[in-house]
Amino acid sequence: MLEVDCPALTPAEVLKTSGHVDKFADWMCKDPKNGDIIRADHFVEEILESRLKGDKEARGVKVEEKEEDPKKKKKKVKATEAVKLDDAVVKEYEEILAKIDNYNGEELGQLIKKYEMKNPATGVEPSPPVAFNLMFQTAIGPSSNMPGYLRPETAQGQFLNFAKLLDFNQQQMPFASASIGKAYRNEISPRSGLLRVREFLMAEIEHYVDPRGGKKHHRFEEVKDVELVLLNRHTQLAGQTHVQKVPIWKAVADGTVDNETLGYFLARIHLFLEKIGIDQSKIRFRQHMANEMAHYAADCWDAELQTSYGWIECVGCADRSAYDLTVHAKKTGAPLMVRERLVEPITIEEWQIDLDKKKFGPHFKKDGKTVEAAVEALPQEKREALAHYLKLDGKITIDVEGVGNGKVEISKDLIVIERRKRVENTREFTPNVIEPSFGIGRILYCLMEHTYWTRGSDGGDEARGVSFMRTP
């Protein structure tokens, strides 16, 4: 594992390529009366939880109250009303809360309308949710011509240095890079002390793995019997929150966890949290649902710890597949790939294209490179069909975006398409990435809450703080 330290200031082009500029956003509402900005999913969650609490009070069920600091200033809000709800409504609310992270902006707006949710501080319904990008934007340099952002994660710096990291590792796979540093997110509603802040410390590992062979991990046997408490996406989509405690080998075998490498890191995360003193009865691994999945993730699990604020996401473990390396390679032209020497050469039969460069350039003039790139990008099945039409008609037509009407005709004197054999001594592939991401502040907060308590002194008048925090 290679440690890297990357800059916090990131050019906008990097984050545009990675998808963060367009997709790294939360849904927010605005109170038209006092101008308060509200995060939409938190608003829906708080309103429904308040109504369920009022229902329990109306039914005579004891509700545990979280102790509040009397010195802390709080916004004036209406007290919870003890109103008994119909059993069907209670079930609806519970199902919504179970999959609250899966709703998009339009669906959150529909929930607010349907259940007549109003801001408790003003009694007014907030505006429809709109997307709000969570990155802090700035300008780089005195001319301010280069836009940039404070990094929302440390991962992009690691991906940009992939080629150097691979060289440092003597071109050997698999390997990993790691980075510890500050990340910055312009949270809509920071709250709960260290749990939701705009500047925080995180530690991320990017483990690069060969996708061929099902993403096996050579040390999976060491952790296969570690039992994890899992809340999968199917359970959440059914509006339920019951969990299953299963050994990680079984979760991988039945497809709940996608592959061995992802399973290996989930088990290692569990063992780490156990070692530092996290209460094992207050930990679960929750799988992301489709709508809450990050734009770069193929699968993702969160290690959530239970606190007085509820279940808090403290560690994320995502299968980023080959997304990041692929998009950065496409944008920059840099080959972010691994070349592996084959033990035995292999013979490949394929359709190959030859262009007459002396005629091709003058014929297409300024569009020559664009057309050539489109031709080279043609898949094998398309090449086979075009070879047939070229032989039959003496010309072919291909789609080329940005040239004329999007259709380009190429005659047989400019192009040859033939089926040939070639021998390969090396294999090229883009590695997949498994990423464990640790929120240091959240882990420390949960650790203190899990290990710190007070007990009465001999006199009975004073309380003494006791901590069972471990030092690994």
Language-model segments: residues:
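TRNA-recognition modules of translation machinery and tRNA-sensing kinases, especially anticodon-binding
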Residues: 1-472
